[in-house]
Swiss-Prot record:
It comes from Dictyostelium discoideum. This is Differentiation-associated protein 2. Residues 1-22 form the signal peptide. Keywords: Differentiation, Endoplasmic reticulum, Signal, Vacuole. GO terms for cellular component: endoplasmic reticulum; secretory granule; vacuole. The lineage of its organism: Eukaryota, Amoebozoa, Evosea, Eumycetozoa, Dictyostelia. It is found in: Endoplasmic reticulum; Vacuole. One of its GO terms (biological process) is cell differentiation. It comes from the Eukaryota.
Length: 151
């Protein structure tokens, strides 16, 4: 419950910040559906807890890893990164997925974060983090890939 309150508080604060300064990033809903599973109601608290544990620096790690060090039924994995763009304008995209734990893990949310987001200040980094958290929730609800892209 504390994690949910913290997430809501963060989103509210960032919406206020967005009023006073230009946003460095935005959400993009793609048409791409991922082959995942609908999150069972009993796992919803674990999902919210894991999303709440996300940190800005972990969004941009290349190492494939459980970036939230989950103990519950859901984990958030860094699935690696890949390049996009043309030769002179290549950039990295970081592939993050919320998955069920266990032998036959299934994706329940899929988010990509572009490394071309220019978040220099703590406020801008908090904005990007809040967008990533929102992207996980929207992806879980829609079954679609969400991207956090430069504004």
């Amino acid at each position: 419950m504390k994690q949910i309150i913290r997430l809501i508080t963060t989103l509210l604060l960032l919406s206020l910040i967005g009023i006073t300064c230009a946003a460095v990033a935005k959400l993009h809903e793609t048409d791409k559906k991922f082959k995942g599973v609908e999150l069972p109601e009993k796992f919803l608290d674990d999902f919210n807890l894991e999303v709440g544990k996300l940190q800005y620096a972990n969004l941009f790690r290349s190492k494939k890893d459980d970036i939230t060090h989950s103990a519950g039924e859901i984990r958030i994995d860094q699935q690696g990164s890949f390049s996009r763009g043309e030769k002179k304008k290549k950039f990295k995209v970081y592939n993050l997925q919320a998955q069920t734990n266990g032998k036959s893990s299934k994706t329940v949310a899929h988010v990509e974060v572009f490394d071309t987001i220019d978040a220099k200040t703590k406020a801008e980094q908090n904005e990007v983090l809040a967008l990533a958290k929102e992207a996980f929730t929207k992806s879980k609800d829609s079954g679609k890939l969400y991207q956090v892209i430069p504004n």
